[in-house]
């Protein structure tokens, strides 16, 4: 209950017994033993739905991300309504969605990555995605995706996908760089009139091709060693034969 009050005539006004608030209902938070303190159980975004409080594992940023704001390492989904500047690094255990333009940054997503305005990599950018990648465009970027890749265009990028690589939209083009699509590559325009070297590889993962090249090199080295051993044995046999003839 509250405290008694006094009216303008000095008469006491008795306090009414207050009505306790019902406990909060929802998810994503813990309640103290006395029921008076609520603490978030996870990092994320608070939303209110009528009489329910829900903390979602989402980090939402309404501006740009750069070296000044600091890098991001989050256990859920990350949504950025601005751009991501050069030198920034964003890592999310789940999906990443970026509305603005990305420039020379590093992005790591445990699920999907959505780049609504593409990536200007400047040779500094790297993308690592466990799910699928959706991008408007990519330039001068290293890309590793476990799922499929869907974009409008790629210029001088190294793209590796364990699934299919699909280029559609206005340009639907690959110009320069290397693109590996284990399950196939769909593209309308490959290379350009300037004869920029453009490589596409279908059916074999880049890492497997590298491993095969390493094994082939190892075989060549072993063969050279074997040839040297055989030449040495032959030389010894000749020396032993000459010694026997002299006896």
Task: Provide a role label for each language-model segment.
Residues 1-146, 152, 178, 189, ...:
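Charge-rich, low-hydrophobicity low-complexity segments
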Residues 165-167:
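Phosphate-interacting basic helix/loop segments used at nucleotide- and nucleic-acid interfaces
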């Amino acid at each position: 209950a509250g405290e008694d009050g006094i009216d303008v005539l000095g008469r006491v006004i008795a306090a009414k017994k207050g009505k306790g608030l019902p406990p909060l209902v929802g998810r994503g938070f813990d309640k103290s033993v006395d029921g008076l303190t609520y603490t978030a159980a996870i990092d994320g975004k608070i939303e209110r739905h009528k009489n329910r409080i829900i903390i979602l594992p989402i980090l939402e940023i309404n501006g740009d991300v750069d070296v000044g704001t600091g890098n991001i390492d989050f256990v859920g989904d990350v949504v950025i309504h601005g751009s991501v500047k050069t030198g920034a690094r964003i890592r999310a255990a789940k999906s990443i969605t970026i509305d603005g333009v990305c420039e020379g940054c590093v992005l790591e997503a445990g699920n999907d990555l959505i780049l609504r305005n593409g990536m200007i990599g400047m040779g500094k950018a790297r993308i690592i995605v466990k799910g699928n990648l959706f991008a408007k465009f990519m330039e001068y970027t290293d890309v590793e995706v476990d799922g499929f890749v869907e974009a409008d265009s790629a210029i001088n990028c190294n793209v590796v996908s364990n699934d299919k690589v699909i280029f559609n939209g206005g340009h639907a083009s690959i110009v320069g760089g290397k693109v590996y699509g284990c399950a196939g590559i769909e593209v309308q325009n490959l290379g350009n009139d300037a004869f920029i070297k453009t490589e596409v590889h279908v059916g074999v993962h880049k890492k497997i091709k590298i491993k095969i090249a390493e094994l082939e090199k190892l075989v060549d080295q072993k063969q050279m060693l074997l040839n040297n051993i055989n030449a040495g044995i032959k030389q010894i046999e000749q020396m032993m034969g000459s010694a026997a003839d002299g006896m």
